[in-house]
Amino acid sequence: GAVGRRLKGDEGGKWGVGYGVDLAVPVNYTSNVVVKQAYAEGRWLLGTLTVGAKEYPMELKNNELSSGSQTLGRNARPIPQVRLALPEYWTVPLTRGWLHLKGHIAYGKLTDGDWEGDFTARQTKYTEDVLYHSKAGYLKIGNEDVFCPWSFEVGLEMASLFGGRSYLPNGDGTMRVYNNGTGLKAYLDALIPGGAEANETQYKNVEGDQLGSWVMRINYENDDFMAAVYADKFFEDHSSMFQLDYDGYGSGDEWDVKKDHKYLLYDFKDWMLGAEVKL
């Protein structure tokens, strides 16, 4: 069952308060009660602050028809988090109503550490107390106040898993424990990818698991019908994010020295495409 109060109940005022609890009682499952949602949230003007686990709609897609999103989808239960958001498009001043933006930033914590340990029987790699970060920003070009049926939306969605304790087998039945960063620097490295893993030495990358999607949507709408096409381009790491990676390192002892102005262009794949028509 579920109980709650939506923020829209205070629509029109400067302030708003909402909350929700949604529970399920499964059969033949690992838990007797499943908390689907449990959150409290507040709004001041256009900004919202949400604390807890809440389901969020997908952006730039039809939530009733789409099969999902490649980064911030709905195919898993929500992660407990603190989320600061501008959930609806805000019109940028001095753009004559043509440019709008929205987005969010959030930090949370995964709750499946015990399950990972049980599932792996603590014999293969697993991690406990993993922290979570997500952020997204969207721009819309269009003006509903003038006769222009076209609009264009583009956005960047990113998520990261970081922190916690990683357990790796030694081969003799014992486990090595790596305490990943959980301080302020780790949170900043999740926000702006940087740092390195606790067990990395020579071949260092950024800290945590960094992934995301470029999303875009083109809309045409008049009094008779609406049509739209959208795209979701998944990436993991910086090189995949920009489809380009440096490829001019030396060899031998100069394996990590930049020698030439050479770059590698990755294949354009991992796209999800869709179309929508309303009559």
Model-identified regions with their sequence ranges:
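Residues on the lipid-exposed face of transmembrane beta-strands in outer-membrane beta-barrel proteins
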Residues: A2-R5, A38-G42, V51, V82-E88, ...
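Extracellular loop and loop/strand-boundary signature of outer-membrane beta-barrel proteins
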Residues: D22-P26, S67-L72, T120-K125, E200-K204, ...
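Short loop/turn motifs that connect adjacent beta-strands in outer-membrane beta-barrel proteins
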Residues: G4-V17, R43-G47, Y89-G103, K140-E153, ...
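Surface-exposed loop and membrane-interface regions of Gram-negative outer-membrane beta-barrel proteins
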Residues: D10-W44, Y56-N75
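Residues that define the transmembrane beta-barrel architecture of outer-membrane proteins
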Residues: G1, S31-K36, A76-A85, D129-K135, ...
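Long, internal scaffold/assembly segments composed of regular secondary structure
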Residues: F152-V154, F162-L279
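Outer-membrane beta-barrel translocator domains and adjoining extracellular loop/strand segments
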Residues: T30-V33, K61-G68, G113-R122, R165-G171, ...
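Transmembrane beta-barrel strands of outer-membrane/channel proteins
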Residues: V17-V25, G42, L49-E55, L101-K109, ...
